Amino acid sequence: MMLRTFTLLLLCIWLNPGMTSLAVESQPELWIESNYPQAPWENITLWCKSPSRVSSKFLLLKDNSQMTWIRPPYKTFQVSFFIGALTESNTGLYRCCYWKEKGWSKPSKILELEAPGQLPKPIFWIQAETPPLPGCNVNIFCHGWLQDLVFMLFKEGYTEPVDYQVPTGTMAIFSIDNLAPENEGVYICRTHIQMLPTLWSEPSNPLKLVVAGLYPKPTLTAHPGPILAPGESLSLRCQGPIYGMTFALMRLEDLKKSFYHKKPIKNEAYFYFQDLKIQDTGHYLCFYYDGSYRGSLLSDILKIWVTDTFPKTWLLVQPSPVIQMGQNVSLRCGGLMDGVGLALYKKGEEKPLQFLDASSNTGNNSFFLKNVTYRDAGIYSCHYYLTWKTSIKMATYNTVELMVVAWPSSVFKVGKTITLQCRVSHPVLEFSLEWEERTTFQKFSVDGDFLITDIEGQGTGTYSCSYRIEAHPNTWSHRSKPLKLVGPAGFLTWNSILNEAVRVSLTMQLASLLLLVVWIRWKCRRLRLREAWLLGTAQGVAMLFILMALLCCGLCNGALTEEIEIVMPTPKPELWAETNFPLAPWKNLTLWCRSPSGSTKEFVLLKDGTGWIATRPASEQVRAAFPLGALTHSHTGSYHCHSWEEMAVSEPSEALELVGTDILPKPVISASLPIRGQELQIRCKGWLEGLGFALYKKGEQEPVQQLGAVGREAFFTIQRMEDKDEGNYSCRTHTEMQPFKWSEPSEPLELVIKEMYPKPFFKTWASPVVTPGSRVTFNCSTSHEHMSFILYKDGNEIASSDLAWGNPGGSTAHFLIISVGIGDGGNYSCRYYDFSIWSEPSNPVELVVTEFYPKPTLLAQPGPVVLPGKNVTLRCQGIFQGMRFALLQEGTHTPLQFQSTSGTSADFLLHTVGAQDFGNYSCVYYETTMSNRGSSLSTPLMIWVTDTFPRPWLSAEPSSVVTMGQNVTLWCQGPVRGVGYILHKEGEATSMQLWGSTSNEGAFPIINISGASIGRYSCCYHPDWMSPIKIQPSNTLELIVTGLLPKPSLLVQPGPMVAPGENVTLQCQGELPDSTFVLLKEGTRQPLEQQRPSGYRADFWMPVVRDQDSGVYSCVYYLDSAPLVASNHSNSLEIWVTDKPPKPSLSAWPSTIFKLGKDITLQCRGPLPGVEFVLEHDGEEAPQQFSEDGDFVIDNLEGKGIGNYSCSYRLQAYPDIWSEPSDTLELVGAAGPVAQECTVGNIVRSTLIVVVVVALGIVLAVEWKKWPRLRTRGSETDGRDQTVVLEECNQEGEPGTTTNSPSSASQEVSVELTVPI
């Protein structure tokens, strides 16, 4: 008999929570049933049961050969194989299998039937549930094949059993708690029949129980490292302190398939992986054990990554990306990989600034910059840093920009920011900052901190501050001592200086090497052989260095090439003027600046030639006022304003030019590109409200067009652009009342018609009315090939796409806004061009960003139900004036109609409506001058095109069958909104009316039900407009009051659980004759059925029941003499209609995207109560988890949680009936975008550099080997060194000089000696 030994070191791992189980692999269960104790061997049946799923076929095997198989009439969990009387021919080894989707399952455990009169030998195995240390809990399982056996556990050395059990099934579990060394030993299990204590089974195979953890734990290391690419080699070394042990290595994700043993001579073992694969990623550990299976502690877990791309890293700056000079800042770098080194890089520098080794990378890794200066400002990123070679590609990474604020220094650099701090020793109400060089400059602050940015190099100057206190808010203090901001202006940085120095140095080195080669060739063109190596080496080295330098320059240029990120520019603000003309047009002039961006913090007003005028914070309307007072000659000039956001300054607004104290500001004229034969609008912006506009053409004295007061701007229209309309245009503004005051003419606008390509096709992939944060893609396409595209917003270029190589026969470009902001709205268009010819502008797309203003109300006039062929007007009622409105229909991408209005509402006419106009409509309003910031969408309004109102439905809540005194609400429900309802009661002349309902439901509450409330009700629509459309009444509702008669009884035939398609009869038995019976179902507001039988019982027949007929039923009855006054409810009766219960739904929370190391809760929900849920994972034979509430927590330990899941459930009252599995739910891993690490050009350059370096090394090695031999020859002939030879060579090269020295003779000899060689 073979002795089976189990080491708890392994078994405690196998079933550790969160790990993959090795012991259970979806094996079926096989057991015996017989008619013992009367005749235990005369009627034997073998049962085979599937562990987790139903099957259509089952197979019985005997002695490794097929004996028989059964196909049941329907899928089931278990089947029986009848054996009959046990004879010699029936003895043997039995196993069974069941049919899965792709073949037969694993066979069951072996059942051995021996000769009659002896029970089968039980199966004996062991499991542990905690880590393998003394004190863990162990379960010993004994499987006895028969029901209701007595199980005995014996231990070697003991005559009596150490434990026994009488379980109800076929298996006993013997538990050993707090495992101790005294529990070691050999165990066996035997069984016998309770009624026949003398009939014993054969002893099971023995188990040797060994307590692990008796030896110290080994160390596990990886060579060359724990992170490698697929296809590379890995060596794992497990080293312990004791020689002669057997070492074992395992991967926790798949213990059964990745379990390795080695018995080396030394105290260490190497486990080799020659060709790594992605699936080799996981957590590895090792241990060792002696010949008696006494094991060591487990090594520390070693995580091995096999990946072709590093996961993405991220970088976070603390405390802020904007840091004051001299302070400390930490850059925290993180990623999915731990135990790997990290390196901090700064843009513009090749070498890393700092390193973090692998031991310190534990998830909270920070690089520290102390006493930051301007040199530390820049863009930083972090990467994984490995100390071994690997071919893993670098993934994408985020960058952060560190800005250094030069406080408290007073040295001001152009483009930098300084914080001026005004401080006093007592509380103040407000601080004020003045700039002596700008008399109109003034800033205010509550905390005394003023940020000064040196825009346009004008930040230097002398500043002072003052304050006021709350007790005297109108009195300001004396000014502080002045502070002067000075310093060199410019943008030179150490980085740029170093770059230039490197370039100059490289150029000088190349020039020096070239000069050296020329000099050697000129001075030594007649050198003898023993010095020839110097010339060859110098030339070779010089040329190799030149080639390497050029390659390095090319590599740097290629490596520093960055992908251009298209960022939406900060929209420029709008500037205008307000005054109280015509009474005093220049006595009280105020300039206003407004930004279309909702994130604007401050506004700055500037004047050409003077600079900074003033700064004002943004109001709630995202605007600011700059009062100038009475207009004087000092105010004349050109003004513009900027808006400031968190880290950006907008473009300047259009310039407003004040030209005199009695002349209106000069307007600004603009127009789109003129296209032959098409309409052209010329825009004239006049800065002030209530002005008249005039358009002039050069060469004509009178205006070509004039417009009255239409706001601050006017649009002149040329209906059809022709050659005669070309020329220079200008516009002027004037006051509306005499005496007229005119502005200066605007700058001229030249209109020239050019030959153009046809306009492109321009659209958005989804609706142009979007919510903040949405993704918007613009598609610009043309039939012309190889075109470049430009995207415009409000006439300004914001993005381009060069040479969009599309499908044959056309070109296409896609412009993407990943997350729309409130300032991204506007009018978008596109154009395409080739080398010299441009296309016409596309039709504009108005992108409206909603949820900035309150939603409007949409109403239909005369009503939402319209006869075919009639007109209907949809009125969109907003809140603010001067908005633009858009009408949308559900199912269409683009708005149906647009309207601009000076009021607060817009009317959209649907003319001669037909069936295609039926549907839901909504509307939105938005600003046209402020990036199309829009309102939320209105509540949808359904428009019905029909000659008859749809029939409403009347129901009662909570039910139409209620007890006396209860409150009930009658709901008249219909699909038409904005219509009144009328409620009728049978036998009464008056009706209840509900006018102008704004929802699609009308509620009629009835308080404290009494006898007067009992009756039959109906309802109908009651439109508040005159309409020939027909009105239909609703269904009739009977309001029944219960509790006045004895309750009936309710029975079901044939039973409470039936298969779909069968017939069911519900029998309601009352106690009084001449009654009407009412059948009710829980959850429904209306009775299901009513009957008036001749006797005391009503039979409610339900033919061909379906799943939806499942539920809780009850019944009541009432007498014909007192209708609708009913009895108490019968007892509730629950009915299940199922062959298989309906499949559940499976969802994931918070999402199906699985981040490594994070948990996901899978929620399995079914329609039936009192069930038990089971979760299955594709690739695993056995169910993974069971739950009564349907919640399963999946931890993605080692990345094993990813895959396809499904769930099912079974009824606790009917445990053999399982539902269909749910739809498959896939959990996927979060993966960042993979970035291409280097270009093909850089790969080629890098290869050439390697070739050059190798060639350089070979040349130097060859010459170095020649040098000692040449030195020896030279010393034998003339005994002089290299220096003397060079000097003589120089002398020989001089004209008129002869040399007869022995050295020269020796040189000649040396030359002659080498010729034969």
Curated annotation (Swiss-Prot):
The chain crosses the membrane at residues 500-520, 532-552. Gene3D superfamilies: Immunoglobulins. GO terms for biological process: regulation of DNA-templated transcription. It comes from the Eukaryota. Residues 1296-1309 have a biased composition (Polar residues). Residues 521-531 are cytoplasmic. GO terms for molecular function: activin receptor antagonist activity; inhibin binding. Residues 1-20 form the signal peptide. SMART domains: IG (SM00409), IGc2 (SM00408). Residues 21-499, 553-1317 are extracellular. InterPro entries: Ig-like_dom, Ig-like_dom_sf, Ig-like_fold, Ig-like_Receptors_ImmuneReg, Ig_sub, Ig_sub2. Disulfide bonds join C48-C96, C238-C286, C333-C382, C422-C465, C780-C830, C876-C923, C1068-C1115, C1164-C1207. The keyword Metal-binding does not apply. Residues 1290-1310 are annotated as: Disordered. Glycans are attached at N43, N328, N371, N871, N967, N1063. Seems to be a coreceptor in inhibin signaling, but seems not to be a high-affinity inhibin receptor. Antagonizes activin A signaling in the presence or absence of inhibin B. Necessary to mediate a specific antagonistic effect of inhibin B on activin-stimulated transcription. Interacts with INHA; the interaction is not confirmed by standard receptor binding assays. Interacts with ACVR1B; the interaction appears to be ligand-dependent as it is diminished by inhibin B and activin A. Interacts with ACVR2A, ACVR2B, ACVRL1 and BMPR1B. Interacts with HECTD1. This is Immunoglobulin superfamily member 1.
